[in-house]
From Swiss-Prot:
Function (record text): Component of the ESCRT-I complex, a regulator of vesicular trafficking process. Binds to ubiquitinated cargo proteins and is required for the sorting of endocytic ubiquitinated cargos into multivesicular bodies (MVBs). Plays a role in the proteasomal degradation of ubiquitinated cell-surface proteins, such as EGFR and BST2.
Gene: Ubap1
Chain residue ranges for the region called Interaction with PTPN23: 260-290
Domain remark in the UniProt entry: The UMA domain mediates association with the ESCRT-I complex.
CC per GO annotation: cytosol; ESCRT I complex; plasma membrane
Taxonomic lineage: Eukaryota, Metazoa, Chordata, Craniata, Vertebrata
SUPFAM superfamilies recorded: UBA-like (SSF46934)
Protein name as it appears in the record: Ubiquitin-associated protein 1
GO molecular function, one term: ubiquitin binding
Bias-annotated ranges (Basic and acidic residues): 78-100
Keyword Repeat attached: yes
Subunit structure and binding partners: Component of an ESCRT-I complex (endosomal sorting complex required for transport I) which consists of TSG101, VPS28, VPS37A and UBAP1 in a 1:1:1:1 stoichiometry. Interacts with PTPN23. Interacts (via UBA domains) with ubiquitinated proteins.
Biological process according to GO: protein transport; ubiquitin-dependent protein catabolic process via the multivesicular body sorting pathway
Domain UBA: 389-430, 451-498
Region (Interaction with ESCRT-I) residue spans: 1-95
Length: 502
C-alpha cells in the first residue's frame, strides 16, 4: 500500500479531495464567455500612439511668461539703482543741510513710518516680554526703608460709607396705633376706640374697667382662634358652636363682646411690630360660618394676625372652616391664604334676634372655580363622603384643598387608599391624559390596567379610541387588547371574528 501510494505520488497527480463532495462559490467559478458583436475589432494601440502628435504649446507659453517676469524685475532693479545714485549726488552737493532734510523726510515719510502700537506695549520689546529681569538691591532697600507713598489721585474718603438716604427712613418709625386710628376713623365703634386708647389715662374708673374687659376678651379670642397646624402643612381654624364638627375634634367657644360695630370693606397696611410688647391686632381677613348658631344670630369674627414667625415664613397657611358639616348637611371648604389675593373684607355683625332659619352670609369676591373646592356633584358622592371615617375624610379634605374635585378624589381614594402621594400621582396622570383629549372613562381603564408604563397607557388609549370609532364595544376592546398585549393586528382580527360570530 505504501509503495503504491508513493508511486502515485511520484508518477502522477494525486488529490486527497477526490470523490469528496463540496460546494464552490460562484465567485470562484470561471466567468462565462461574452460574445462580441459581429464586426467588432479593437484598434491597434501602438499605431495610435505613433500617430499622436503633441505640440507643447502650454509649456512654451509658461517659459515665455517666466522670461517676461524676469525682464520686468530687472527693469525695476535698474530704476531703483538709478534713483539711489541721483539721491547720492544731490546729498553730496547740498551738504549737511541736505542731509538733515533728507533724514527728516525719510523718518517722517509715510512709507517709512512705523505702524501704530499700543502705548502700554510701546516700551516693551517683543523678544523681551517674557524675559525675567533682575531687581536691583538698591531699589529693594529703598522700598523697605521708605514709607509707602500714597498716590495723588488716591482718596481714602472715596471708600468710606457715604450717607445712605435710607438710613433716615429707617429712623422714622411708624406709630401703628395712630395709623389704625386714621384708617378706622368714622367706621369703628367703641371697641376699637377703647382698644387704641387703652394706654391713655382715663378719669373715669368704670371706663378703665371696661377697657380691660374688652382687651381680655380680644386676647381670649386671639388664643381661642389660634390656627391649628396639621401634619401635612395646612392650617384650619376652629369651628363655632355645635352645628359644625371640626376635623381635629376640638370645639371653641368665644366669650361675649359687650359692644360690636360694623366694619365693612377695609384693607389695612402691613405694620411691623413686636408681638411681645404690642397688643394691637391687625385685621387681615375674615371667615364666616354658613350654619346658624344656637341663638339664631350669625356673627363674623375678627381674625387676629399674630402668628409665629415660622408660620409667616412658611407662607402656606390655609384659612377657613372644616370641610364638612355633617349635622346641617352643608359644606364649608377650607381656603388657603394664597388663594385669597388682597382680600380683607371684614364684617362684624351685631347681635340681632333673627329667625333661626335665616342666616346671612358673606361672599368673598374674585374667587375662581379652580380656587374654591366645590360640593360633590352627585348625591352618591355626597353619601360616600358622609360614610367615610375621620381619617379618610381628613385625607379627602387635604387633597380637595389642593384644587381637585370631590368626585375625582373619592374615585382615586377607592383605587389607591389613604396614601396621599399615590392619590396625587393618580390624579396627576389622569388629568394629563384627559388634557390630551382621551375619554375619562378610557383613561380610568388604562390607569387600572397599565399603572407603571406610560408608553403602554398611551398605546392602549390610542387603540381603544380607534376601535371605538370603528364601532366595537368597549368591553370586547378591553378584553382583546389585554389578551393580545396591545397588538393592533391580532386585536383587530379577534374583534372582527367576534363581530362575525355575533
Amino acid at each position: 500500500m505504501a509503495s503504491k501510494k508513493l508511486g502515485t505520488d511520484f508518477h502522477g497527480t494525486f488529490s486527497y479531495l477526490d470523490d469528496v463532495p463540496f460546494k464552490i462559490g460562484d465567485k470562484f467559478k470561471t466567468p462565462a464567455k461574452v460574445g462580441l458583436p459581429i464586426g467588432f475589432s479593437l484598434p491597434d494601440c501602438l499605431q495610435v500612439v505613433r500617430e499622436m502628435q503633441y505640440d507643447f504649446s502650454l509649456e512654451k507659453k509658461a517659459i515665455e511668461w517666466a522670461e517676461d517676469i524676469r525682464l520686468i524685475q530687472e527693469a525695476q532693479q535698474e530704476a531703483e539703482r538709478k534713483s539711489e545714485e541721483a539721491e547720492a549726488k544731490v546729498n553730496s552737493k547740498s551738504g549737511p543741510e541736505g542731509d538733515s532734510k533728507v533724514s527728516f523726510s525719510k523718518t517722517h515719510s509715510p512709507a517709512t513710518m512705523p505702524p501704530p502700537i499700543n502705548p502700554i506695549l510701546a516700551s516693551l520689546q517683543h523678544n523681551n516680554i517674557l524675559t525675567p529681569t533682575r531687581v536691583s538691591s538698591s531699589a529693594t532697600k529703598q522700598k523697605v526703608l521708605s514709607p509707602p507713598h500714597t498716590k495723588a489721585d488716591f482718596n481714602p474718603a472715596d471708600f468710606e460709607c457715604e450717607e445712605d438716604p435710607f438710613d433716615n427712613l429707617e429712623l422714622k418709625t411708624i406709630d401703628e396705633k395712630e395709623e389704625l386710628r386714621n384708617i378706622l376713623v368714622g367706621t369703628t365703634g367703641p371697641i376699637m376706640a377703647q382698644l387704641l386708647d387703652s394706654n391713655t389715662p382715663r378719669g373715669n374708673s368704670g371706663s378703665v374697667l371696661q377697657d380691660e374687659e374688652v382687651l381680655a376678651s380680644l386676647e381670649q379670642a386671639t388664643l381661642d382662634f389660634k390656627p391649628l397646624h396639621k401634619p401635612n402643612g395646612f392650617i384650619t381654624l376652629p369651628q363655632l358652636g355645635n352645628c359644625e364638627k371640626m376635623s381635629l375634634s376640638s370645639k371653641v367657644s368665644l366669650p361675649p363682646i359687650p359692644t360690636v360695630s360694623n366694619i365693612k370693606s377695609l384693607s389695612f397696611p402691613k405694620l411691623d411690630s413686636d408681638d411681645s410688647s404690642q397688643k394691637t391686632v391687625r385685621l387681615a381677613s375674615t371667615f364666616h360660618s354658613t350654619s346658624c348658631l344656637r341663638s339664631g344670630a350669625s356673627r363674623n369674627f375678627l381674625k387676629p394676625s399674630t402668628q409665629s414667625s415660622a408660620s409667616e415664613l412658611n407662607g402656606d397657611h390655609a384659612l377657613g372652616l372644616s370641610a364638612l358639616n355633617l349635622n346641617s348637611g352643608t359644606e364649608v371648604p377650607a381656603l388657603t391664604s394664597s388663594q385669597m389675593p388682597s382680600l380683607s373684607i371684614l364684617s362684624v355683625c351685631t347681635e340681632e334676634s333673627s329667625p333661626p332659619s335665616t342666616c346671612p352670609t358673606v361672599t368673598p369676591l374674585n374667587f375662581s372655580v379652580s380656587q374654591v373646592p366645590t360640593m360633590p356633584s352627585c348625591p352618591q358622592a355626597y353619601l360616600e363622603l358622609q360614610a367615610l371615617s375621620p381619617s379618610e375624610r381628613q385625607c379627602v379634605e387635604t387633597v380637595v384643598n389642593m384644587g381637585y374635585s370631590y368626585d375625582c378624589v373619592l374615585r382615586a381614594m377607592k383605587k389607591k387608599g389613604e396614601n396621599i402621594e399615590q392619590i396625587l400621582d393618580y390624579l396627576f396622570a389622569h388629568g394629563q391624559l384627559c388634557e390630551k383629549g382621551f375619554d375619562p372613562l378610557l383613561v380610568e381603564e388604562a390607569l387600572e390596567m397599565h399603572q407603571c408604563s406610560e408608553e403602554k397607557m398611551m398605546e392602549f388609549l390610542q387603540l381603544m379610541s380607534k376601535f371605538k370609532e370603528m364601532g366595537f364595544e368597549l368591553k370586547d376592546i378591553k378584553e382583546v387588547l389585554l389578551l393580545h398585549n396591545n397588538d393592533q393586528d391580532n386585536a383587530l382580527e379577534d374583534l372582527m371574528a367576534r363581530a362575525e360570530a355575533s
